[in-house]
């Protein structure tokens, strides 16, 4: 099914009916409006109702919707059929749509490396000495993109009365609590605003107003349909029932009940306004959750059944099935010529950083798939709360593309925390508590300061400054300064004979080339000084108590894994060559070559992950602090961490999940 392109034909009934007869019928019959209530994922029932309306030929002159009712109603008003909307609902990846994490393939190599530092990706803003949180758990970037893709055929229509069916979306002003009726502007933005449940989704700013879910002010917009000109209103109520006392079992259920109070109050007020000429359809939805969008398609038959039960009343409105013609919009992205590009950028980043990532050029036809990929890459810069696009026209009548990049209200300073615990249940355990401070968009080219600290198994404090030196971040420099204390146990014949502590500081300076989002080359120089002490035991060989490091490291990194922890596709390879000499500041001369990687094979729901590690020290000349170490979870799990050490290493593991 083609979800994102409406057919090029205009559906006309003139072949069946003389034009004067059709016109007279359209003028004489009462105007019918459709009011679709909010109800989250329960909105799948609206599709079932639309199927019956189509089958019976009921003419719909106006549509007003709230929240999920606005989404279903907006798609129908834009020209999609009930079957096409069902296809969209079935094929949408709701897990991705309701997530703000960019696809890993679109993230920069730097962001991929940072991901490995903290298992949990969540963070908080930190500005002027205060913690700041986002205005919603979900900021909605992927929802925005989903709506723009679905409604691309009508994205140029700014007056909702000009849609195939005139349409209104209902939202609520977060500041005043007033009902806001959206009758024009960006249709994707209107739908996004109407369904922004406070707290769950960030509000949407339209015309200098912060808008949230319309259910707070008018969950069943009967009055809106009436004001549009409807003589008869078909109202479909899918709102959730109030929770019983037995169902109020936690703070979450109490919060849900408070929301139900507001929604139920506005719904009841609209129900009271229905007259004898109007029709109310209330699908029986039982315990279907308003939050589980993956189950929404299963609710369609409930809506169909409820509408069919009122088939006689609907047939009377159909007047023999002579519905007015529906015009389906003609709009193919490949026919749209981009004559200019506008960048609306509220961040410190230079506009060229955004423009250089657009796979769209002035004077070319628009490629929607390429544009969406570009939007993903801009969003993955981790600076913006949303990146959207509009088709616009300038004063000269030229057609163009406008990219809207809205910076995060709770950035660009972020704090992130992590805790690592491990135990072999035989007396050996470790912990590591870490925190990171990140300052994004320090300058027009996207410089970034990152401070990472940890205590526990390894104490470390590092200051890292990453500076791209061109708008596409192809070249970069990265100076770093760090303090570090590490403890190593030295084993011999499965006996821990000594504990070694290395305490020191170091500086690194790197220059690199990002070949693309999957491949990178870099060269680093590291200079470090540290003290080494044997805390307990005896190594059995002399140890230099002063460590001097002066090294050049050349590295190639490839990372196309779709997930760091449980990948289903892609590969990972890191290979490096290390050269140290007295002339560089080291205590001696030594060379190493090493690498590690992962390869994934997937078949249906079965995944196989092959990991490898290789390390080789030329002439066995590497000092003890540069020995390879193995042992611990996933790296010979039967051994304690770093139980094996030496000048050479090789390990291969195979995992199934």
Where do the PLM segments sit?
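Bacterial N-terminal signal peptides
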Residues: 7-17
């Amino acid at each position: 099914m083609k979800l994102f392109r409406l057919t090029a034909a205009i559906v006309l009934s003139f072949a069946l009916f003389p034009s004067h007869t059709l016109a007279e019928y359209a003028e004489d019959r009462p105007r019918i409006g459709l009011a679709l209530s909010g109800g989250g994922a329960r909105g799948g029932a609206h599709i079932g109702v639309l199927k019956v309306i189509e089958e019976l030929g009921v003419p719909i002159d106006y549509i007003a919707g709230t929240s999920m009712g606005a989404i279903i109603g907006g798609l129908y008003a834009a020209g999609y059929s009930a079957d096409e909307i069902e296809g969209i609902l079935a094929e949408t990846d709701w897990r991705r749509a309701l997530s703000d994490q960019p696809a890993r393939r679109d993230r920069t190599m730097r962001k991929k490396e940072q991901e490995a530092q903290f298992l949990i990706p969540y963070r908080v803003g930190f500005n002027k000495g205060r913690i700041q949180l986002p205005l919603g758990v979900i900021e909605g970037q992927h929802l925005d993109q989903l709506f723009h893709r679905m409604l691309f055929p009508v994205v140029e229509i700014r007056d909702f009365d000009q849609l195939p069916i005139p349409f209104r979306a209902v939202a609520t002003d977060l500041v005043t609590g007033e009902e806001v009726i959206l009758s024009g502007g960006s249709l994707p933005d209107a739908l996004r605003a109407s369904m922004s449940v406070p707290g769950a989704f960030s509000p949407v700013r339209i015309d200098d107003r912060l808008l949230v879910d319309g259910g707070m002010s008018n969950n069943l917009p009967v009055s809106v349909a009436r004001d549009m000109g409807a003589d008869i209103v078909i109202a479909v109520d899918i709102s959730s029932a109030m929770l019983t006392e037995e169902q109020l079992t936690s703070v979450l259920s109490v919060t849900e009940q408070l929301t139900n109070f507001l929604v139920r109050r506005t719904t009841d007020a609209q129900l009271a306004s229905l007259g004898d000429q109007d029709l109310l359809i209330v699908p029986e939805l039982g315990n279907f959750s308003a939050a589980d969008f993956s189950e929404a398609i299963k609710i369609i038959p409930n809506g169909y059944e409820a509408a069919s039960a009122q088939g006689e009343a609907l047939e009377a409105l159909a007047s023999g099935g002579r519905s007015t013609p529906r015009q389906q919009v003609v709009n193919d992205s490949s026919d749209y010529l981009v004559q200019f590009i506008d960048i609306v950028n509220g961040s410190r980043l230079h506009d060229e950083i955004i423009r250089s990532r657009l796979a769209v050029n002035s004077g070319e036809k628009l490629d929607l798939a390429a544009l969406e990929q570009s939007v993903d890459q801009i969003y993955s810069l981790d600076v913006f709360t949303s990146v959207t696009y509009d088709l616009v026209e300038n004063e000269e009548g030229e057609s163009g593309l406008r990219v809207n990049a809205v910076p995060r209200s709770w950035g660009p300073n972020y704090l992130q925390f992590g805790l690592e615990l491990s135990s072999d249940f035989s007396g050996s355990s470790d912990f590591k508590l870490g925190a990171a401070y990140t300052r994004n968009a320090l300058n027009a080219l996207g410089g970034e300061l990152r401070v990472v600290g940890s205590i526990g198994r390894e104490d470390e404090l590092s200051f890292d400054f990453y500076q791209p030196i061109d708008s596409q971040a192809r070249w970069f420099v990265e100076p770093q300064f760090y303090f570090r204390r590490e403890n190593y146990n030295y084993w011999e014949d499965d006996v821990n004979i000594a504990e070694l502590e290395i305490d020191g500081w170091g500086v690194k300076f790197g220059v690199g080339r990002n070949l693309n989002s999957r491949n990178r080359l870099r060269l680093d120089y590291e200079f470090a000084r540290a003290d080494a002490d044997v805390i307990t035991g005896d190594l059995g060989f002399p140890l230099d108590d002063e460590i001097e490091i002066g090294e050049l490291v050349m590295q190639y990194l490839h990372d196309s894994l779709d997930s760091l922890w449980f990948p289903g596709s892609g590969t990972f390879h890191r290979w490096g060559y290390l050269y140290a000499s007295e002339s560089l500041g080291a205590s001696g001369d030594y060379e190493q070559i090493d690498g590690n990687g992962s390869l994934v094979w997937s078949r249906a729901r079965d995944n196989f992950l092959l990991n490898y590690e290789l390390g080789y020290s030329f002439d066995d000349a590497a000092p003890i602090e540069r020995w390879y170490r193995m042992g611990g979870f996933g790296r010979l799990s039967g051994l304690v961490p770093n139980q094996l050490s030496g000048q050479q290493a090789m390990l291969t593991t195979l995992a199934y999940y």
